[in-house]
From Swiss-Prot:
Role of this protein: May play a role in DNA repair. It seems to be involved in an RecBC-independent recombinational process of DNA repair. It may act with RecF and RecO.
SUPFAM superfamilies the UniProt entry points to: Recombination protein RecR
Alphabetical GO biological process terms: DNA recombination; DNA repair
NCBIfam families: recR (TIGR00615)
Presence of the UniProt keyword Zinc-finger in the record: yes
Protein keywords: DNA damage, DNA recombination, DNA repair, Metal-binding, Zinc, Zinc-finger
Similarity comment: Belongs to the RecR family.
Name of this protein: Recombination protein RecR
Protein's organism: Alkaliphilus metalliredigens (strain QYMF)
A matching Pfam family: RecR_ZnF
Amino acid sequence: MNYYSAPIAKLIDEFSKLPGIGRKTAQRLAFHVISMGYEDAEKLSNSIIEAKKSIKYCRICTNLTDKEVCNICSDPNRKKSVICVIEDPRDVVAMERTREFKGQYHVLHGAISPLEGIGPEEINIKELLIRLQEHPVEEVILAMNPNIEGEATAMYIGKLLKPIGIKVSRIAHGIPVGGDLEYADEVTLSKALEGRREI
C-alpha cells in the first residue's frame, strides 16, 4: 500500500536510485526537499541539470571537467613526466587532498571485473596507451583500489607497460584491502604514494 501521493512517491523512488541511499534515507531527503522554499528547491534542481549538461570528460586524462581540458592537465606547473592512473574521478580529489602528487592523472572510470562483465575494453586503458605513445612519460603510478578488481587492473596495465620501458610503480598499501581511495585520509594516501613500489 502506498501512503504517499504520486509526486512524493516518485521523488522517493528517484532518490532511492542513488548509490548508498536506502528507502528510509530517500524518504527523509524527499520530505526535506518538499519542506524547502521553492527558490531553494529550484536552485537544487537547476544545479543538477547544469552539472549534467556541462560536465564532460577531459580530452587528455578523462577526468570530469566543464572544459575541453581539465585544470590539472592545463596547469603548466604539473609534472607531465609522471602519470597516476586511478579508477574514478573521486580518486583524483582524494589524491589532490594529499598535496603530495605533482604529476598528472589518467582516470580509467572503472576496474577490470570479469564477474561483472567489465574487461579491459570497458575502461579507459586504450586511451592511456594512446596517450603514452603520443606523449611518453618517465613513470606511471598505478593507484587502483586495494581490492581484487584493483589488483587485477594494476597487474594488467603493468604487463602492458613493462615492455615499453616505462617505470611502473604501485602505491603502497597503507590503504586497507577492500577499501576505496576516496575514503582514505590525506596522511594515509601521502604515505601510500611515498611508499609506492616498482612492478
